[in-house]
C-alpha cells in the first residue's frame, strides 16, 4: 500500500514528533446529542505546529471532536460535552472562559466556503476590528495584506480588495476564509473538510497553503481523502463509531497501522 509519496514519507520522518509539545489535550471527551452518544471517552492530544488529520467513515465522530476544540458544538441544541480539553493550560470548557476569545485563538474553516457578503477587505478586517487588534487604519491595512499573503491570495486580489468576496472563485473564497481566520492571530486552525467543494487545482493550492501555515499555526483537519491526509499531515487519528481507534505518525498509520480497522478503512474495505 503506497499511499504516501516519497516526499511525504520524508516529511513525516523529519518531523520529530516525540519532541513536539502538545498544544491541545483532550482527555475522556464524550459528546451527547440529547440521549444519543456520539463520542466515547476520546483521549487525543494535538501537537504544536503540526498538521493532525482526523479520518474515518461518515458519522464516525471526527467532525464532532473537531468542533469540541473551540466549542462550536455549543451552538447545537441538546449537545453536551464531558471530559476535559485544554489549550495550553486553559480549560476550554471552564465556565468562566470567554468563548469569543477562545474562537479567536482556535479558528475554524468550514467545508463550504462561507465569505461574508462584504468586500474582500471587510471579510478580513472584521475580526481584527471587533477584537481591537488594530490601533489605526494603517494597522488594519497591514493586517489585511499580511493575512491575504499568508493565505496565498494577496497577489490575486490586491487590486480589487474593495470588491465583493462572493465574486471570487470557490478556491479563492476558501483561501479568503483562511485569511479571515488568520487575521485574528489564532494559535490553532481547525479545518472541516476544507477542500471537499473544490476542484483539484484549487485543492492543490489549499494543501500547499496548509504546509506553509504549519510554520506558524497548529492545524487539525478533518478529511475523507486518504491521499490528502497522507499529503498534508504529520499525525493522523482514526475514528470509528464514535471511538478513537488509534493515533500515530502519518507514515506509520498509512504503512503499518496498529489496528486492523484502520488498515481496512485505508484499503477501502469499508467507509
Curated annotation (Swiss-Prot):
Its main location: membrane. SMART domains: AAA (SM00382). GO terms for molecular function: ATP binding; ATP hydrolysis activity; ATPase-coupled phosphate ion transmembrane transporter activity. One of its GO terms (biological process) is phosphate ion transmembrane transport. It is a peripheral membrane protein. InterPro entries: AAA+_ATPase, ABC_transporter-like_ATP-bd, ABC_transporter-like_CS, P-loop_NTPase, PstB-like. PROSITE patterns: ABC_TRANSPORTER_1 (PS00211), ABC_TRANSPORTER_2 (PS50893), PSTB (PS51238). ATP binds at residues 56-63. Keywords: ATP-binding, Cell inner membrane, Cell membrane, Membrane, Nucleotide-binding, Phosphate transport, Translocase, Transport. It is an enzyme of class 7 (translocase). Residues 24-266 form the ABC transporter domain. It comes from the Bacteria. The keyword Disulfide bond does not apply. It is found in: Cell inner membrane. SUPFAM superfamilies: P-loop containing nucleoside triphosphate hydrolases. Gene3D superfamilies: P-loop containing nucleotide triphosphate hydrolases (3.40.50.300). It catalyses: phosphate(out) + ATP + H2O = ADP + 2 phosphate(in) + H(+). Disulfide bonds: none annotated. GO terms for cellular component: plasma membrane. Its EC number is 7.3.2.1. The complex is composed of two ATP-binding proteins (PstB), two transmembrane proteins (PstC and PstA) and a solute-binding protein (PstS). Part of the ABC transporter complex PstSACB involved in phosphate import. Responsible for energy coupling to the transport system. Belongs to the ABC transporter superfamily. Phosphate importer (TC 3.A.1.7) family. This is Phosphate import ATP-binding protein PstB 1. The gene is pstB1.
Amino acid at each position: 500500500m503506497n499511499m504516501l509519496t516519497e516526499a511525504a514519507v520524508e516529511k513525516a520522518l523529519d518531523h520529530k514528533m516525540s519532541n513536539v509539545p502538545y498544544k491541545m489535550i483532550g482527555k475522556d471527551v464524550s459528546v451527547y446529542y440529547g440521549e444519543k452518544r456520539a463520542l466515547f471517552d476520546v483521549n487525543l492530544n494535538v501537537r504544536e505546529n503540526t498538521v493532525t488529520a482526523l479520518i474515518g467513515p461518515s458519522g464516525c465522530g471526527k467532525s464532532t471532536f473537531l468542533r469540541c476544540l473551540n466549542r462550536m458544538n455549543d451552538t447545537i441544541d441538546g449537545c453536551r460535552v464531558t471530559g476535559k480539553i485544554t489549550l495550553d493550560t486553559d480549560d476550554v470548557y471552564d465556565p468562566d472562559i470567554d468563548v469569543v476569545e477562545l474562537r479567536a485563538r482556535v479558528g475554524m474553516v468550514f467545508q463550504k466556503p462561507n465569505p461574508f457578503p462584504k468586500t474582500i477587505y471587510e471579510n478580513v478586517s472584521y475580526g481584527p476590528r471587533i477584537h481591537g487588534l488594530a490601533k489605526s487604519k494603517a494597522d488594519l491595512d497591514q493586517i489585511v495584506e499580511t493575512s491575504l499573503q499568508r493565505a496565498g491570495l494577496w497577489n490575486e486580489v490586491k487590486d480589487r480588495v474593495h470588491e465583493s468576496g462572493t465574486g471570487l472563485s470557490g478556491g479563492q473564497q476558501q483561501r479568503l476564509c483562511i485569511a479571515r481566520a488568520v487575521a485574528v492571530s489564532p494559535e490553532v486552525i481547525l479545518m472541516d473538510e476544507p477542500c471537499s467543494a473544490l476542484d483539484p487545482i484549487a485543492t492543490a493550492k489549499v494543501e500547499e497553503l496548509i504546509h506553509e501555515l504549519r510554520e506558524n499555526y497548529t492545524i487539525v483537519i478533518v478529511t475523507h481523502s486518504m491521499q490528502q491526509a497522507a499529503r498534508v499531515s504529520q499525525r493522523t487519528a482514526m475514528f470509528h463509531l464514535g471511538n478513537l481507534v488509534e493515533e500515530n505518525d502519518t507514515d506509520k498509520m498509512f504503512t503499518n497501522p496498529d489496528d486492523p480497522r484502520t488498515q481496512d478503512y485505508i484499503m477501502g474495505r469499508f467507509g
